[in-house]
Design a protein with these regions (language model features):
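N-terminal beta1-alpha1 ligand-phosphate binding loop
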Residues: 2-20, 26-30, 34-35
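Glycine-rich phosphate-binding active-site loops on the catalytic face of alpha/beta enzymes
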Residues: 22-35, 82-101, 145-160, 183-187, ...
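Short glycine/proline-enriched coil/turn segments at helix->beta-strand junctions
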Residues: 21-23, 51-53, 89, 116-120, ...
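Catalytic cores of alpha/beta
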Residues: 9-20, 66-84, 128-145, 165-202
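Short, flexible active-site-adjacent loop segments at beta-strand->alpha-helix junctions, enriched
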Residues: 10, 63-65, 99, 125-127, ...
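Hydrophobic faces of well-ordered beta-strands that scaffold small-molecule active sites
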Residues: 2-8, 25-27, 55-61, 93-95, ...
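Active-site-adjacent beta->alpha loops and helix N-cap segments on the catalytic face
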Residues: 11-14, 31-56, 72-75, 98-117, ...
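A short, flexible beta-alpha/helix-coil linker loop
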Residues: 31-32, 64-67
Length: 208
C-alpha cells in the first residue's frame, strides 16, 4: 500500500486531504518560499481535526524561507516552536540545519532534537545540499540522534532516481526511511515501484 504525505499550506486544505483518504499530512505556511512554521492557533486546530479523523500530522519547523545556516535567534524560535508542537500533540516534526559548508550543523541540531522529544523527526530537504561524499556520515549521525526519516527531492543529481537510489542505500543501512519529496500525483506509483518505497511526499503528491 502506497502512503502519500501531502505538504499542505495551512489549515484550509486539510479537510480536503483527509476526505481524499490520506493517513498522514504535513503542514507549513508560505510554501512559495519553501515553507515556514504554521501559527500556534493553526497547529492546535490542525492537530484536533487530524486526530479526530485518525490522521497523523507532521509540521514543518522553519523560521523563514531560504536555506540555513540559521542564526541564534532563529534557532531559539525553532526550539520554541518544537516545544509548542510537542505540547499540542503534533505527531512529527520536519526540520533541518546545515552549515555554510553544507554539512550538518550538529551544534544547531542538538537542542532542536531535544525539543522534538516524543515526536517523529524528519530531516528536511536541506539534505539535498549535502555533498554526495558527505551523505554517509550525515545519515549515520542522524540515525544516532533518533531521526526517523530523511526527505530528498533527488534534484542534487540530474537523474532523480539515481540520486534517490544512492541515498536510499545509505538510509536503509542504518534503519532510516528515505521519503522521496517533490513527487507529483501522476508519477507517484511509478516512482514508488522503481525505488521500492512505500511513502512519498510533496505539494502535488495528492491531486486536490
Amino acid at each position: 500500500l502506497l502512503l502519500v504525505e501531502p505538504l499542505l499550506e495551512n489549515y484550509p486544505q486539510l479537510p480536503a486531504a483527509v476526505e481524499a483518504g490520506v493517513k498522514r499530512v504535513a503542514l507549513a505556511d508560505n510554501l512559495a518560499v519553501g515553507g515556514t512554521t504554521i501559527s500556534k492557533g493553526v497547529m492546535g486546530e490542525a492537530v484536533r481535526y487530524a486526530h479526530e479523523h485518525q490522521v497523523s500530522l507532521d509540521v514543518v519547523i522553519a523560521p523563514r524561507g531560504g536555506h540555513s545556516p540559521y542564526n541564534d535567534v532563529e534557532l531559539k524560535m525553532m526550539e520554541a516552536d518544537l516545544l509548542e508542537a510537542q505540547q499540542l500533540g503534533v505527531d512529527g516534526a520536519i526540520f533541518g540545519a546545515l552549515t555554510l559548508q553544507h554539512q550538518l550543523d550538529q551544534e544547531a541540531l542538538r537542542p532542536l532534537i531535544a525539543a522534538a522529544g516524543g515526536m517523529t523527526m524528519t530531516f528536511s530537504t536541506a539534505f539535498d545540499q549535502i555533498r554526495p561524499q558527505d551523505r554517509g556520515t550525515a545519515v549515520d549521525w542522524l540515525a544516532d540522534q533518533g531521526f526517523d526519516h530523511i526527505l530528498s527531492t533527488g534534484l542534487a543529481n540530474e537523474d532523480r532516481l539515481a540520486d534517490w537510489t544512492m541515498t536510499k542505500r545509505l538510509t536503509d543501512s542504518v534503519g532510516l526511511t528515505l521519503i522521496p519529496a517533490g513527487v507529483a500525483a501522476h508519477e507517484a506509483q511509478e516512482i514508488a515501484t522503481q525505488l521500492g518505497t512505500k511513502i512519498l511526499y510533496g505539494k502535488k503528491v495528492l491531486a486536490l
